[in-house]
Amino acid sequence: MINSNLIKNVEFLNRHNSKQNLKLGSFADMNQTHSDIVLEIDKKGKYEADALITETKNLKLVVKTADCMPVVISDGKKVGVIHIGWKGVENKIFFKTIKKFNLSNLKVSIGPHAQKCCYEIKDDLFKKFPESTIEKQSKKYLDLSKEIERFCIEKSIEFENSSICTIDSDSFN
């Protein structure tokens, strides 16, 4: 039996891919280190970064995550991928990346990641992100996507969040 969350995830990715009219071609991958390094590239390869941007047709950008947040962005001319964990939220990698895009045409897609229902954190992180945390039953949880969603709403940027949790979804365990 196929899990309904898996179907949602595949549908989410297919919607995004069809919007970008992707074809098979070259791939650019990242050695992700929870940094704030954003690179604009034009050829395939392995890069030391947590965000890649390209204008090169048929160059596929790869982002790998477990519980971190994969974000795909495009303004119709450029496309980018971002790997964001709590360190990425702290060092504002999303905002550093979108500075290189035309905000008036920007579209943001947030993929499956640890959601606020399950991403339990300790007091030190709770204090670092007071607007992106919740407390329930004496436990503290981080909402990784909250800052991005808030920004997109304020700037009227089109965004989509898969809302699939990689911690409690059967598709990821």
Feature locations, PLM:
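Active-site microenvironment for binding and transforming phosphate-containing groups
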Residues: 1-173
